[in-house]
């Protein structure tokens, strides 16, 4: 079985891929770059190379604009932010998986704020970007923490479970 966890924020995405006991971690900026010459999108180092060379247009703030049902502009074209976020997730998955087959991949995407209308829209879009609905789950950060502590009863009983959440504008500590 293969698992992919994606913890999203407006600036970063942290990915953890687990397959056959092997783990791979990756941290990416939550940004996209659209190539000026062709309809191709890039993330991470490739995105910065294109933008610095003047061959691409960077798009930032994907999560915040998606939650507001906003529009973002790349190369004089307006895009729905939620569609760009789904495109980013597809490219991020491809980067962490590489050439590995992902037929039984189960994906959990952790969101800092769980806004139902946004989550429903993103969940409806993700299958178009290769995330099967039956194997993709969108959860809040709090829900992911609760799932973790419920799976660790010994740590919970000893009072040894805590979580720091450092975001752009806040620092939260959750204790169980």
Where are these regions (language model features)?
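Early-domain small/polar-rich strand-loop-helix modules and first-structured segments
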Residues: 1-71, 127, 135-147
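A short acidic Gly-Thr/Ser loop motif
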Residues: 6-12, 157-172, 176
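Phosphate/oxyanion-binding active-site loops and adjacent basic polyanion-contact surfaces
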Residues: 58, 78-89, 118
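Short hinge/gating elements
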Residues: 68-79, 105-107
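Phosphate/ATP-binding catalytic cores across multiple sugar-kinase/actin-like superfamilies
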Residues: 84-100, 145-152
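Short helix-terminating capping/connector loops at secondary-structure junctions
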Residues: 100-104, 132-133, 156-157
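Short glycine-rich phosphate-binding loop at a beta-alpha junction
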Residues: 101-113
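Conserved helicase motor "Helicase C" RecA-like lobe of SF1/SF2 P-loop NTPases
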Residues: 120-122
């Amino acid at each position: 079985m293969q698992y992919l966890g994606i913890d999203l924020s407006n600036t970063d995405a942290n990915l953890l891929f687990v397959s056959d006991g092997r783990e791979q971690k990756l941290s990416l900026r939550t940004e996209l770059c659209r190539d000026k010459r062709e309809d191709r999108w890039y993330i991470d180092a490739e995105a910065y190379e294109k933008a610095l060379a003047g061959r691409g247009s960077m798009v930032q703030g994907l999560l915040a604009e998606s939650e507001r049902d906003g529009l973002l502009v790349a190369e004089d074209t307006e895009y729905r932010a939620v569609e760009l976020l789904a495109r980013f997730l597809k490219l991020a998955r491809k980067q962490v998986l590489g050439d590995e087959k992902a037929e039984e991949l189960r994906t959990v995407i952790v969101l800092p704020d769980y806004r139902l209308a946004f989550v429903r829209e993103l969940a409806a879009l993700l299958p178009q970007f290769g995330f099967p609905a039956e194997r993709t789950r969108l959860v809040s950060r709090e829900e992911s923490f609760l799932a973790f502590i419920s799976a660790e009863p010994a740590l919970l009983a000893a009072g040894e479970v805590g979580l720091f959440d450092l975001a752009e504008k806040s620092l939260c500590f959750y204790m169980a």
